[in-house]
Swiss-Prot record:
It is found in: Nucleus. Pfam families: LRR_9 (PF14580). One of its GO terms (biological process) is mRNA splicing, via spliceosome. Associated with the spliceosome. Transmembrane segments: none annotated. One of its GO terms (cellular component) is post-mRNA release spliceosomal complex. Residues 213-223 have a biased composition (Gly residues). PANTHER family: U2 SMALL NUCLEAR RIBONUCLEOPROTEIN A. GO terms for molecular function: U2 snRNA binding. Residues 211-230 are annotated as: Disordered. This is U2 small nuclear ribonucleoprotein A'. LRR repeats lie at residues 19-40, 41-62, 65-86.
Amino acid sequence: MRLTVELIQNSLSYINPLKDRELDLRDNDISSLGNFPFFPRLRMLLLARNRVRQIQPSLANSIPGLTTLVLTANNIAELADLDPLRNLTKLTHLVLLENPVTRKEYYRLWIIWRIPSVRFLDYQKVKDAERAKAAELFGTATEPTALASKILGVKSRTFDIPSGGAADQPPPEKRLRVKLTDSERKRIEKMIREAKSLQEITRLERELNEGRIPGGALDGAGNDGDQMQL
């Protein structure tokens, strides 16, 4: 199951006692962490007890201000699978308990080295001695050791399988894919970036899923740009 705007809308989002914007997505069936709308004010993301095994490389572009990420009891398996988190430059608190990756050799030192902004890992403060040991083992970002290069080369092969099986998917002959020109694609991306609400993003996503090009994105008036391909 992928994260959708509808799921975000239906989840708890509030200001916590620390005055931070918090989004609670615990106890869902999410397998891929990504597909967020632009959410610059989000500070805390709770994702415990999902099925997350993949983190999209573009995650930091959508939630650049994230400081706390709780991924307890998910399915992340390899150290390199966590690499997209290093682009969350404000991430200080990370929880990965009850993921297969925590059983990997060098797990804690790897996170400390690869995501240097993290100050608390699995509720334990990162110590200066740990940072020094991590640097000794893995080198620097520009000059990694052979061990670091080896770890970076091992990633999980991930597939997004719907939780309800094949019945959740429409038959192949019913799936519509919109043909977009480069200019139409850029306009749609701009419309999503400049959307003022989640409802507006939902509308754009729904129109695309239904095989329609949102108004304002078509090339020219009366253009037949909303042709659909079965």
